[in-house]
Amino acid sequence: HWQAGMLDILYSNEEIFVSYTEDIGNDKKWCKWFSSWCDSYTSTSIARGLIQDNELVSLNNIFQSQPPLVDKIHWGSRLMIKDDLLYASVGERAQGSVTQDPTNHIGKIIRINRDGSAPKDNPYSSEPNWLPEVFQVGLRNPQGMALNSNDSSIYITNHGPKGGDFFGEVVKGTNYGWMDVAWGGTDYDGSIIGDGSAWKEGLLKPIYRWIPSIAVSDMIFYKGNFFPELNDKVILTSLKAQRLISLDFNDGKASNETVLIEGMGRLRDVEQNDSGEIFVIIDDNNSGIWKLVKK
């Protein structure tokens, strides 16, 4: 399934949450007549598991994005817990403007309880045509998600098309605008998206953008003593540019982009441990988990 598979995993209070590609199946009776109908329909799904004595004793689905689709790209899907609520990003699966449609989960941030139910104070829970899990709309391919302990806010990274990657905040009931806007990017053939605007009044504006695209992926807000020079900086991975970069982030503004590592391969994931050590995952033929060391 191209970019599909296991998408993210999160441990919290003896539970794990896993986002992954769920195969919904197809209408096999039509396969011999229409080969395209043999493609499986898939959804971004989330399962919750219980850990006891370092063993997984249960694993059950708590969320399945709607509708299932056959497209095999732009899954996004990162997980974060804040105030005992689970936030998850759902990519737009190359469906474009459906991110503005309230009757689906495509291209959105969803917020659910740990059992998969929708919180009553979600922004659209009382709207008859909105799915109650929807928290934020208008995203393309949100690849990273992190909680900033300094301001208790959640932030994301998102892939633009040909340019327009961005770092921005998850804000209740807001709209990033895809694909009415492309955040400064264009389509892959160079044509404009929407009316060519990078941003419009009424939409949430990204905090920091990359033009051309670097395929920004995972992120953390670094807190630790192992690399004191990185404290309170945003650390981000890049697939296309194959870099680990840092941004200063103060008062809602990002600046001073600095390349920390370059040329190791497509950097997919970044994490830190309690000691402040930093680990990255390379999404390439030379895949593996690497630990950063001091010079």
Per-range role (PLM):
Residues 118-121, 154-157, 175-181:
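Acidic/polar loop patches that form or flank catalytic/metal-binding clefts of enzymes
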Residues 110, 169-199:
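Mobile, glycine-enriched helix-loop/loop "lid" segments at the mouths of ligand-binding/catalytic clefts
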Residues 130-169:
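Repeat-solenoid scaffold signature
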Residues 1, 49-70, 105-144, 194-211, ...:
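Blade-edge beta-strand/turn elements of extracellular beta-propeller
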Residues 141, 161-163, 174-175, 183-187, ...:
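Short, catalytically relevant binding-site loops at active-site mouths
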Residues 267-269:
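Repeated scaffold domains used in trafficking and secretory/extracellular systems
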Residues 1-96, 146-160, 212-250, 273-294:
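Acidic, Gly/Ser/Thr-rich repeat motifs that build Ca2+-stabilized beta-propeller blades
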